Curated annotation (Swiss-Prot):
Positions occupied by motif DXD motif 2: 190-192
UniProt binding sites for Mn(2+): D72, D190, E192
Subunit structure: Component of the oligosaccharyltransferase (OST) complex.
Keyword Amino-acid biosynthesis attached: no
Name of the featured protein: Dolichyl-diphosphooligosaccharide--protein glycosyltransferase subunit STT3B
Lineage start: Eukaryota, Viridiplantae, Streptophyta, Embryophyta, Tracheophyta
One Gene Ontology biological process: protein glycosylation
Motif DXD motif 1 mapped to chain: 70-72
GO cellular component: endoplasmic reticulum; endoplasmic reticulum membrane; nucleus
Record field: catalytic activity: a di-trans,poly-cis-dolichyl diphosphooligosaccharide + L-asparaginyl-[protein] = N(4)-(oligosaccharide-(1->4)-N-acetyl-beta-D-glucosaminyl-(1->4)-N-acetyl-beta-D-glucosaminyl)-L-asparaginyl-[protein] + a di-trans,poly-cis-dolichyl diphosphate + H(+)
Length: 735
């Protein structure tokens, strides 16, 4: 009966149309092979990571508005706006008379144009595609866009260093790492916005060239280096790390034609391209920071020559003699060349910032203007934990795996990681440079660990075991039983460790999101605080003051302030400034520092010599804003005293302590900066239960409440007293 039913069933099925096998409903045709599934999964993950890296940097736009952050980005925005309106030729030959009065500044020869040109190209492309956006919006979103591009480079770099898994993990880690997000949020329109992408791209292309020996990859790395040179002065790190890496490979006996092709092409073409940047020019072959790369380049030619001679000679003793003579001659010639070049002035000495990286105390002792910048300070341990979280612990594990599988590529990433972490410890700003290396090495640790643990889960558990064995076979059977019994424990341990790994990664994601939202997405030009009832208070005093300058002062008015605010005054106030954030002329900045730290009569003479019309100071005594000019005042004294010996720091201290209360020094209580900040402040009650004139930023009652101004008059004070502007009176008539 069953035999008859089967044919009937088959016939009935044959008469019905098979919808699943038709061309429209065929799912079999959609079935992908294993490699295709992996490719689709990789592309999907990278797409999600790309989007994640972009949207994670938009907190500031959502919380505030689309605006430029910090100080330097305002100069970059102003120059980009000029480029898009006037064209590249005018931009390249632009003399800016609104900065560094009366000296002015040649813009084209004193900046790295890569960021501006990149944003302008994006803007012109969008306009060509009929997306009519303002250049400011392009500038605001340039950093998130290139951060997303950096995740793709991190993926390919990790894949080249280790495997596909390491590349994917590296892309995820760097997408949300606070160490990178700190300088790539929306509105952070600074050189690092594109420079970190260029840095990682150059390293990836160079390692690819070393691994393959391909001339095309070597040339690509040279163009990547050119883009890095055009974008940021941190290119010096590349031109010193790559030769150091090549030198290590030569010393360890890893010389190869692949290395020869990669380095020579990258150095020669990269050098020629870099010299086209006016700000770099012949420094690439004359400054001390670049001499190491040239020395390694010449050493490579000696290695190649010796390798060729060794191939031609059959006599080992003769080659050893020739080797000693050649090496000795090369060392002597190189030493003489360096000595003559240095003595003649052809080779310029290292810059102060380069010295400060090798000796952290150098800037404080010799160049206080470098030490005065907060991002040039040494890094605290808490900053590493804040910016890296669990990557601090994954980094050593990644180094272990790299040393375990040592290749030309892993040697490079180890050197990159160790050197960049050292420099990050010397200067907090360079945490940004170390972040890609930390993420890549940590990704290797995560990928290798997960791969080892999942391999334990894939092991097949034996079901049958031999019950009885005799003779020599009994010991073999017992060992099998022991192994089989240990497998469940290994699998349980692997599962527990995997859960722990993913838990730590989830905590890393939560930490990164919190840091991004709370610490790195607040523009310094608009301040925010929480009120007594938890309500959000916005202090928009900076833009209020700059708007007042733009609307209420003459177009040719000269504004004197500390150099921190120069770029913002020029970009938003559209007025001429005495000094700004370029800090190229230490004497000019010292003159402003001398004026701020002098008595009013002496300061007035200095201001008249500079044709100053208005003086702007930042004061946080009312709101508790600690980054004001009073807290920066000692740097003004140090920088001014470095050029003008009449300014002495001990005159402003009491027993080595900086004070603004009644115990402050007479010079401090009567200097121009003190007067301008605390003028009329003695009449103001800032906090309940505190006397009038209580400074909330320093937590003391000021020492001089009866301040009278003779040569200046108050022109404008913002609603929260954060920015105060004073008009310089014309000289009185004299008989």
């Amino acid at each position: 009966m069953g035999g008859k039913s089967e044919p009937a069933k088959s016939e009935s099925m044959a008469t019905k149309p098979d919808l699943l096998n038709t061309s429209f409903f065929s799912f079999k045709s959609l079935k992908l092979k294993t490699k295709q599934q992996e490719l689709l999964l990789r592309i999907s993950i990278l797409g999600l990571v790309y989007i994640l890296a972009f949207i994670a940097r938009l907190f500031s736009v959502l919380r505030y508005e689309s605006m430029i952050h910090e100080f330097d980005p305002y100069f970059n925005y102003r120059t980009t706006l000029f480029l898009t309106e006037k064209g590249f030729y005018e931009f390249w030959n632009w003399f800016d008379s609104e900065s560094w009065y009366p000296l002015g500044r040649i813009i084209g020869g004193t900046l790295y144009p890569g960021l501006m040109v990149t944003a302008a190209l994006i803007y012109w492309t969008l306009r060509f595609l009929r997306f009519f956006v303002h250049i400011r919006e392009v500038c605001v979103l340039t950093a998130p866009f290139f951060a997303s591009n950096t995740t793709l480079v991190a993926y390919f770099f990790g894949k080249e260093l280790w495997d596909t898994g390491a590349g994917l993990v590296a892309a995820v880690l760097i997408a949300i790492c606070p160490g990178y997000i700190s300088r790539s949020v929306a509105g952070s329109y600074d050189n690092e916005a594109v420079a970190i992408f260029a840095l990682l791209l150059t390293f990836y292309l160079f390692v690819k060239a070393v691994n393959t020996g391909s001339l095309a990859w070597a040339l690509a790395s040279a163009f990547g280096y050119f883009y890095m040179v055009s974008a940021w002065g941190g290119y010096v790190f590349i031109i010193n790390l790559v030769p150091l890496y090549v030198l290590v490979l030569l010393i360890t006996g890893r010389y190869s034609m692949r290395l020869y092709i990669a380095y020579n092409c990258m150095y020669i073409l990269g050098m020629l391209l870099a010299m086209q940047i006016r700000f770099v020019g012949f420094q690439h072959v004359q400054s001390g920071e670049h001499m190491g790369a040239m020395g390694v380049f010449l050493l490579m030619q000696v290695f190649y020559f010796l390798d060729w001679v060794k191939y031609q000679l059959n006599d080992t003793k003769l080659f050893q003699t020739f080797l000693r003579i050649t090496v000795t001659s090369a060392i002597l010639v190189g030493g003489v060349a360096v000595g003559v070049g240095t003595a003649s002035g052809y080779i310029s000495p290292w810059t102060g910032r380069f010295y400060s990286l090798l000796d952290p105390t150098y800037a404080k002792d010799h160049i206080p203007i470098i030490a005065s910048v907060s991002e040039h300070q040494p890094t605290a341990w808490s900053s590493f934990m804040f910016d890296y979280h669990i990557l601090l612990f994954l980094f050593p594990a990644g180094l272990y795996f790299c040393f375990k599988r040592l290749t030309d590529a892993t040697i490079f990433i180890v050197m990159y990681g160790l050197t960049s972490l050292y420099f990050a410890g010397v200067m907090v700003r360079l945490i940004l440079v170390a972040t890609p290396a930390v993420c890549l090495i940590s990704a290797i640790a995560v990928s290798a660990t997960i791969k080892n643990l999942t391999s334990l889960l894939r092991t097949k558990q034996k079901v049958s075991q031999t019950g009885s064995t005799k003779g020599a076979g009994s010991s073999k059977a017992s060992s099998k039983v022991t192994l089989d019994q240990s497998q469940p424990f290994q699998k349980n341990g692997a599962i527990a460790l995997l859960v722990g790994v993913f838990y730590l990664l989830s905590r890393y994601a939560i930490h990164c999101t919190w840091v991004t939202a709370e610490a790195y997405s607040s523009p310094s030009i608009v301040l925010a605080a929480r009120g007594a009832h938890g309500n959000r208070i916005i202090f928009d005093d900076y833009r209020e003051a700059y708007y007042w300058l733009r609307q209420n002062t003459a177009t040719d008015a000269k504004i004197m302030s500390w150099w921190d605010y120069g770029y913002q005054i020029t970009a938003m106030g559209n007025r001429t400034v005495i000094v700004d954030n370029n800090t190229w002329n230490n004497t000019h900045i010292a003159t402003v520092g001398r004026a701020m730290s002098s008595y009013e009569d002496d300061a007035y003479d200095i201001m008249r010599s500079l044709d100053v019309n208005y003086v702007l100071v930042v004061f946080g005594g009312v709101t508790g804003y600690s980054s004001d000019d009073i807290n920066k005042f000692l740097w003004m004294v140090r920088i001014g005293g470095g050029v003008f010996p009449v300014i002495k720091e001990p005159d402003y201290l009491v027993n080595g302590e900086f004070r603004v209360d009644k115990g402050a020094s007479p010079k401090m209580l009567n200097c121009l900066m003190y007067k301008l900040c605390y003028y009329r402040f003695g009449e103001l009650t800032t906090e309940y239960g505190k006397p009038p004139g209580y400074d909330r930023a320093r937590g003391v009652e000021i020492g001089n409440k009866d301040i009278k101004l003779e040569h200046l008059e108050e022109a404008y004070t913002t609603s929260n007293w954060i920015v105060r502007i004073y008009r310089v009176k014309p000289p009185t008539n004299r008989l």
